[in-house]
């Protein structure tokens, strides 16, 4: 099966893990700091805190910003953790509709803030598929209204916005090291920031809220969590980070092939990356034309049967039964239509152009046989 994304584990990673497993300290050691320093150097930021997942990173980011009893404005087109973690931190969640690239609509965000901005605890944006949001416009809004900004850049490690690494402009930025991302620590995540006070707070909460006073004594000053990332995982992360730019180049090669081959086809559109951005290509979404919406399940199953592991990103968060019970029925037209249209096809560093051609040929062959027809 040619999956929509795939980890890159080579002999250097295996050797790194073997060495780390033989160390005296498997967790809470120097590899944690080394990984954080490597991330800071790569990102061009001052501070980083690595954690056991991006969900944990989001939870502590919201908590550090003090969103309890306030509203977090976010996108519905994301993995549920973006909103879930805000609820875990005691916030209320409100969804803002998206644009046709899958990113939050900054104009609709501005319209919401014009209505009322007093009780907004944070704005949390997602760089969908690795393609940056319009960060200048969004950052200007958050500064105008004095609202903290979280960039859930879980898709976007290594992506660029106006020649800068994605993750530099927000108060707190989140990254994921899940195996489907360009680098992995098995599970894992990070928060990065130039704000030392916020990162110190997150590091405290990461390990039970405990500080050491003396060699044999400690004090718990906050109610914290066990969100630590092990030294073994961090050792892998350090080695993976060395390969990140190469992995991104390979993903870009596959994406560029698709862009050219899919141009002006009669079945679907693709997302165009603006010339002042560079996507990490975490995903390669195709957006089916409306006459194929109701055939998407048939298309999905046919592609799986042909050995192409597609996926859908994402069901809008407000469509989950939990959120329907919490918030009632919500309809955001662009997010709803994006969900009907979207399929993510294989695009990752383990592929070659022969694989990409197989995906293209198979996709077109199946679509030619699918009967067009609008729903209803």
Swiss-Prot record:
Residues annotated to bind substrate: 4, 24-27, 54, 176, 226, 311-314
GO molecular function, a single term: transaminase activity
UniProt EC number: 2.6.1.92
Catalytic activity: UDP-4-amino-4,6-dideoxy-N-acetyl-beta-L-altrosamine + 2-oxoglutarate = UDP-2-acetamido-2,6-dideoxy-beta-L-arabino-hex-4-ulose + L-glutamate
Database matches in InterPro entries: DegT/StrS_aminotransferase, PseC, PyrdxlP-dep_Trfase, PyrdxlP-dep_Trfase_major, PyrdxlP-dep_Trfase_small
CDD domains noted in UniProt: AHBA_syn
Highest taxon, organism lineage: Bacteria
Record-level GO BP terms: polysaccharide biosynthetic process
Record-linked Pfam families: DegT_DnrJ_EryC1
UniProt modified residues of type N6-(pyridoxal phosphate)lysine: 181
Keywords annotated in UniProt: Aminotransferase, Pyridoxal phosphate, Transferase
TM stretches of this protein: none
Similarity comment: Belongs to the DegT/DnrJ/EryC1 family.
Function statement: Catalyzes the second step in the biosynthesis of pseudaminic acid, a sialic-acid-like sugar that is used to modify flagellin. Uses UDP-2-acetamido-2,6-dideoxy-beta-L-arabino-4-hexulose as substrate producing UDP-4-amino-4,6-dideoxy-beta-L-AltNAc.
Official protein name in the record: UDP-4-amino-4,6-dideoxy-N-acetyl-beta-L-altrosamine transaminase
Organism: Campylobacter jejuni subsp. jejuni serotype O:2 (strain ATCC 700819 / NCTC 11168)
Lineage start: Bacteria, Pseudomonadati, Campylobacterota, Epsilonproteobacteria, Campylobacterales
